[in-house]
Amino acid sequence: MDKRHDPSRRIIAPHGTRLSCKSWLTEAPMRMLMNNLHPDVAERPEDLVVYGGIGRAARDWDCYDKIIEVLQRLEDDETLLVQSGKPVGVFRTHADAPRVLIANSNLVPHWANWEHFNELDKLGLAMYGQMTAGSWIYIGTQGIVQGTYETFVSVAKQHFEGISKGKWILTGGLGGMGGAQTLAGTMAGFSVLACEVDETRIDFRLRTRYVDKKATSLDEALAMIEEANQAGKPVSVGLLANAADVFAELVKRGVTPDVVTDQTSAHDPLNGYLPQGWTMAEAAAMRKTDEAGVVKAAKASMAVQVQAMLDLQTAGAATLDYGNNIRQMAFEVGVENAFDFPGFVPAYIRPLFCEGIGPFRWVALSGDPEDIYKTDAKVKELIPDNPHLHNWLDMARERIAFQGLPARICWVGLKDRARLALAFNEMVKNGELSAPVVIGRDHLDSGSVASPNRETESMLDGSDAVSDWPLLNALLNTASGATWVSLHHGGGVGMGFSQHSGVVIVCDGTDAAAKRVGRVLWNDPATGVMRHADAGYEIAKNCAKEQGLDLPMQE
């Protein structure tokens, strides 16, 4: 019997102001853990899988139940330790210490590979936490929409003089992360053709309004794209097909998209990528009997897809890696020039990171969408001279369906995060918001990750693989008084390729919370500015000076 599988479970986080725990500082992590497994949020909630292949919220259902039980009895001077999804200890700390400290999927570097991890996973000794799955701050596909939108807007500016009308994006993957591409692309003015092998995922994205149409053949999908482009109105199409097949077929036909990328779960060749010619049922069976054969076949198909991406790049498509490590997988099986197309961070996002700008997110623990709309208005009030940000908030309200507890993603940086958070805390204090909010972020942020094939690819000083930075980030957030802090390995790009940290803090309207919020939401993005200034980026150095950061070696 698999202790991780229970189809009878249907987890819905409590709404409103009635507490199940002893305070909001423990109620918040409980609700957010539960929200990660909401049926409209998680990819496979019955298996505790939130997103990203096998990214889980808890190691098994016994561990989940025990975490909930402990959070409900935890005092405000105690801290729960969670080791790879398993609650292993409660210790006396103090009121400003985190209520939960989490470490997921971390392995000594020599053993930091999928083979060793999978053995531990089968023995029930480890859990893959991805980024926000095991750190309890996943908010559904919205969590990556704005970052993807910002990337596609940058693509239009760099390659098409800012004009996306009549142009289209080819991509793969409509899972928890990839599902953002279709909505983000159309919001940026592109049509999008997204290949997906799992029809239930396409249907889920249709239901939550992230995909406009479904196609079952390439000809049908291309006709939909052509019709939309002729009409000047972007459309997103989920095509039920294997990305490797489709990408290669387009090369064969001489059909060149304007933009090419991919967000399949290529980071996990065993569980995340379906080999060409295989059905999902065949792959599921083979994973139980021949793991090495599945990995070999998956990587061979990735090589086909990456070669097609290179060919489409040669034909004129703006081609980018979207952080799933597919280039590395193809390189390992013989595609020697797999890295000839860039990753999205060095190509489009790094200037934002240099100012500590990244995926700031907040969640209304009340469950009331009005609380989010009120915070949207507060953001506009406090940042009045940013029409791009205002446009994003307007589009988000109009086009993004909430999944689980209402939430918002909003890319802001060092100069704005703390003051927005303090304003939210004040709104809770004076009753403008009906309950506390939690504020967190993706681990994909400016100072919280080391990932040489993604966030820290091609750093100016060559420090791509130095992982001291996310460790320092986690330590500083703990010292600053975050409500929960996490330190993970392998998120986004797979085992051996990344280390990263997460942070969440509760705005409960108290003066004590205001002090913690002011520290955490300043220090956290400041570590990103510090990291990039240390690497030699002038934008970061200037930001550090403007914001008065004390960086001894920058004097």
UniProtKB/Swiss-Prot annotation:
One Pfam family cited in the UniProt record for this chain: Urocanase_N
Cofactor(s) needed: NAD(+)
GO molecular function: urocanate hydratase activity
Co-factor: note: Binds 1 NAD(+) per subunit.
Record carries keyword Zinc-finger: no
Domain of life: Bacteria
GO biological process: L-histidine catabolic process to glutamate and formamide; L-histidine catabolic process to glutamate and formate
Residue numbers binding NAD(+): 52-53, 130, 176-178, 196, 201, 242-243, 263-267, 273-274, 322, 492
InterPro entries attached to this UniProt entry: Urocanase (IPR055351), Urocanase-like (IPR023637), Urocanase_C (IPR035401), Urocanase_central_sf (IPR038364), Urocanase_CS (IPR023636), Urocanase_N (IPR035400), Urocanase_Rossmann-like (IPR035085), Urocanase_sf (IPR036190)
Function comment: Catalyzes the conversion of urocanate to 4-imidazolone-5-propionate.
Name of the featured protein: Urocanate hydratase
Gene symbol of the encoding locus: hutU
